[in-house]
Amino acid sequence: MSKEEKIREMCKFIILNLSSIRVIDSSYRFRNIFLTSLGILINESAIIQDLIKEGMIKSEGLIDKSPFYKFISCTEKGKKYYDNNIYKVIIPESYFSEKRLDLVKIFLGLKRPS
């Protein structure tokens, strides 16, 4: 698995985890987390679209002519997939600083905030 594939898979699990905790008003939140908090430039809308097609999350569609999805929540199928596969996620640790690596683990649900 390439570094890009590992990062995409990791982002998928971040989306599943956070949307299982509570309904996410806008997918812009994920863009902010990935870009600002973690320094990852990725098309979160494409990942969300794939997760919707797979039945792992649901959304009320796009926000008026924008690339952002509204009201995103994890389905039971998504929660089960997350629970069964979260420990298989490979975090490309060399890609992140120590502080960002801690944030990755927190967003993945593998570590509690201190």
Q: Positions of the model-derived regions?
A:
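Short amphipathic alpha-helical interaction segments
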Residues: K6, S37-E54, F68-Y69
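A short, conserved structural fragment
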Residues: I52-I63
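Short acidic DE-rich linear segments
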Residues: V104-S114
